[in-house]
């Protein structure tokens, strides 16, 4: 199932083809519209020339911050997101040899997949569940027991049209409102 999250084919294609771009998009997917979050990896790549975990991890924090703040800013909170993305890239570079796809490649089961994703900077319980849903529904990553760790609500993993994007937005908005009660 193709990814239709950013409203821009080239940005969606990058998410489909580059595991690091996918993870960066998932990190950015908070407190901004989904289209903005999932366009972010493409825009970051355009500004940097490529998406290389080791290169991003080794950048001066102020330099990456400036890239995130360049207009239009990559996120509503560019400084915080630059730090989170840099930490994520640092872990991908050191723990997985710069290969973000190695995080889910050859996992033995859903428990291991959930452990690996939850160890990533910026990935709390909800984001882990959403990521596992995305990996299963969009990329066929379905190790034994993955369902126990997947989101049981309509997420970006279920988006395949404008209508399902609106539904995912509505679910996200309702969950946020319920969390504030």
Predicted features by range, described:
Residues 1-13, 17, 110-119, 125-181:
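C-terminal accessory module of base-excision DNA glycosylases/AP lyases that mediates lesion recognition
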Residues 11-21, 31-33, 75-80:
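Structural motif
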Residues 16-19, 34-37, 43-44, 107-109:
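Short acidic alpha-helix initiation/capping motifs at coil-to-helix transition points
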Residues 30-39, 92-98, 139-142:
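Short helix-capping/linker segments at secondary-structure and domain boundaries
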Residues 23-27:
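Short, aromatic/basic-rich helix-turn unit that serves as a nucleic-acid recognition element
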Residues 44-119:
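Alpha-helical ds-nucleic-acid-binding substructure associated with the helix-hairpin-helix region
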């Amino acid at each position: 199932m193709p990814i239709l999250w950013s409203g821009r084919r080239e940005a969606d294609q990058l998410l489909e083809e580059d595991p690091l771009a996918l993870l960066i998009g998932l990190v950015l997917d908070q407190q901004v519209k989904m289209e903005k979050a999932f366009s972010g990896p493409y825009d970051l790549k355009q500004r940097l020339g490529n998406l290389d975990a080791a290169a991003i991890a080794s950048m001066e924090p102020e330099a990456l911050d400036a890239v995130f703040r360049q207009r239009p800013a990559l996120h509503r909170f560019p400084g915080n997101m630059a730090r989170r993305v840099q930490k994520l890239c640092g872990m991908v570079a050191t723990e997985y040899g710069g290969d973000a796809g190695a995080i889910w490649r050859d996992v033995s089961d859903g428990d291991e997949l959930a452990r690996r994703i939850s160890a990533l900077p910026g990935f709390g319980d909800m984001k882990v569940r959403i990521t596992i849903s995305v990996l299963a529904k969009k990329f066929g990553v379905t190790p034994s027991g993955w369902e126990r760790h997947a989101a049981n609500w309509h997420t970006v993993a279920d988006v395949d049209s404008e209508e399902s994007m609106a539904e995912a937005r509505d679910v996200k908005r309702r969950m946020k409102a319920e969390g504030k009660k």
